[in-house]
């Protein structure tokens, strides 16, 4: 969540979430940037990427759409990441900009495999890659996942503006940014 300049800068980076798990968008992907990895997880529906032969590739063909059901893919992605971790590998998971689809899988992985709450997992990933912002539909699915895992939830979907749903963990950031913009523009 931030200005278009920061989004542009951050979307061209590969973010290290764990020593074995990295998150990115398409922009920084080159044969050279892929050399350190043993596996890539491609979360772009229309992109069948040619990958260097040393890479294991998992393609999760999903759209960044609130109606996209991620539940059939949770365990496939988590198992792939864990297998790579156990074998000393490094996984790069990416989507178009590294903001919604791939970020959702990384946050959900931390919830499931590292026993973090949704709020804590989201905040941790956001501290590393501040542009993450899973869409509301993906947040709803992570809230359901958290409920299944822990019989409680730490994030709620709120409607602060008539008809607009926002995760409460995101709303304060949005509100603060809007107020900063108003203050800067003197309005």
Spans of features found by a protein language model:
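PTP/DSP superfamily signal
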Residues: 2-3, 79-90, 106-187
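Glycine-rich, flexible N-terminal cofactor/catalytic loop recognition
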Residues: 8-50, 54
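Beta-strand cores of modular interaction/reader domains in eukaryotic scaffold and signaling proteins
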Residues: 16, 22-23, 39-42, 56-61, ...
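Residues that form ligand- and interface-recognition hot spots within folded domains
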Residues: 25-27, 44-49, 61-66, 95-97, ...
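Short coil/turn segments at secondary-structure boundaries
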Residues: 35, 52-55, 72, 105-107, ...
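Helix-loop module immediately N-terminal to the HCX5R catalytic loop
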Residues: 58-91
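Glycine-rich nucleophile elbow surrounding the catalytic serine of serine-hydrolase chemistry
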Residues: 99-104
């Amino acid at each position: 969540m931030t200005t278009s300049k920061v989004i542009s800068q951050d979307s061209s980076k590969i973010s290290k979430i764990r020593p074995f798990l990295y998150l990115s968008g398409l922009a920084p992907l080159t044969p050279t940037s892929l050399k350190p990895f043993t596996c890539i997880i491609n979360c772009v529906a229309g992109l069948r990427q040619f990958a260097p032969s040393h890479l294991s590739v998992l393609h999760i063909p999903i759209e960044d759409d609130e109606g996209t059901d991620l539940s059939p893919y949770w365990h496939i992605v988590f198992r792939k990441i864990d297998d790579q971790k156990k074998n000393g590998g490094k996984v790069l998971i990416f989507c178009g900009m590294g903001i919604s689809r791939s970020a959702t899988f990384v946050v959900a992985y931390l919830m499931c495999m590292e026993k973090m709450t949704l709020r804590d997992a989201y905040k941790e990933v956001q501290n590393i890659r501040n542009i993450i912002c899973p869409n509301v539909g993906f947040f709803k699915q992570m809230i359901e996942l958290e409920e299944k895992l822990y019989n409680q939830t730490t994030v709620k979907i709120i409607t602060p503006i008539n008809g607009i749903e926002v995760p409460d963990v995101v709303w304060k950031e949005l509100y603060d940014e809007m107020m900063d913009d108003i203050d800067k523009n003197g309005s």
